[in-house]
Amino acid sequence: MSFASLPFVGLVAAGVILYYLVPKKLQWVVLLLASMVFYLAGGVKSAVWLVLVAALTWLTGLLLARQNARPAPDKQTKAAVRHVKKRICAVCAVLCFGLLYLMKYWNFTASALPSALGDKLPRWDFIVPMGLSYFIFQAVGYVIDVYRGKTDAQKNPLRYGLFVSFFPQMVQGPISRYDQLAPQLTAERCLDWRDLKFGIQLCLWGYFKKLVIADRAAVLVNAVIKDNCPYGGAVIASGILFYCIQLYCDFSGGIDITRGVARLFGIDMAENFRRPIFATSLTDYWRRWHITLGAWMRDYVFYPISLSRGFGKLSRWARTHIGGTAGKIFATSLATFIVYFIIGIWHGANFRYIAFGLWNGVLITASLLLEKTFLRWKAALHVNDKRAGWRVFMTLRTALLVFIGRYFTRAPRLRSVFTLLKTTVLHPQPGQLFDGTLLSLGLAKTDFLVIALGLIVLLALESLQERGVQIRAGLEKKSGFVQWAAMTALLLAVFLLGVFRAGYIPSGFIYTQF
């Protein structure tokens, strides 16, 4: 069930009406039923895997809670309890990530192995459940939080099931934390018109980014970025630029719809984007892009690795053989590299996604290792970090690195990445930008104008937000006429400028496949 479909709009409308009509103690049941309808619309087989993961992690949470409650009067007992908890948590994580590996990566592994070995391995054509990566990460995060004693285990399986399956987040996240989302899902609420208004505003803004900008940019991207691309480097670079536009408006637009729908029920979901276009480094970019995935990797991968006993030994060895500061940075850099390697694999079972993770991992690791050298250069050149020119330079440099990285995530295969990059650099053929080639790729002049105007609006609003301007709070101070006029203008823009064609089939979101 696509976000950009009438059945979804009908489900949300019916859900909101029922939510505020039923007794408050049953409101969470309405959310659970709506989530069941949404997920079952994608097929019963997919729902089975969701139920299995939810059941496994719920039971694991109860087992861990029982261990947490065990009396531990001495160090020996505490150590024994900790050992049992680690084993319980490890078994659950292996089963969950094993399922993820089996469904998303097994066939890729078999095909990547040498034929003498890979040909002997069976292939399975699984239908990967919608949101598999997202709900597994969210459920395992809950288990780890219970293991750490950060949150109490949920005893009610249906309430826990709602946390795992809450329908707005099933398409592409965000990856929520139990202590932040679960209490909101089961809270009792009265109708708040501000929540409805903010929710509608967020949804309309998300649909604007998705249907007006992203889906229009996708037409050019699909026409250019493909195997045996016949165009010169300038057109290819334009295709990647439009892909960057498509990806951001598609992903952030979908998250806006997710957060908007949740807000209709009075639920404030985690922010997943913070104006990544203004990032001044790759590290800063990943703090602004897909925030909940980065936070998950930080809390459940980076810290456990860097604080582990093995990494402690490695850090001490590095400080002894490389030097105090350099040794400490070496261990941190290695943990960082591992995280971005995993982020690359998370995006998909393809060597180009692994290369994407390595691209980011190598650059960010290098920045950590060379940070002091870079600071010395800045001091020698008397660079003022606060000057606008320096910030513009850092932002453009980061944008270029992100731009190059997008060749990896959009090219059909890894070999195509290097072919497209080579053509971009060695055979630019800039004349194709002006000889009518761009207008032969499926977009008319009016489409380019709509994209340009949409981006101007988007950049203007995000620029204000970057400066600390609270746009919705400012709009709230305006008269009711101005507020409804703004929402009406957005609604008209979506319906009049959205990419709806004859026989329209709602387009999916790019990050759904991840």
Question: Across the structure, where does each feature detected by a protein language model lie?
Answer:
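Membrane-embedded transmembrane alpha-helical bundles that form the catalytic cores
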Residues: 1-513
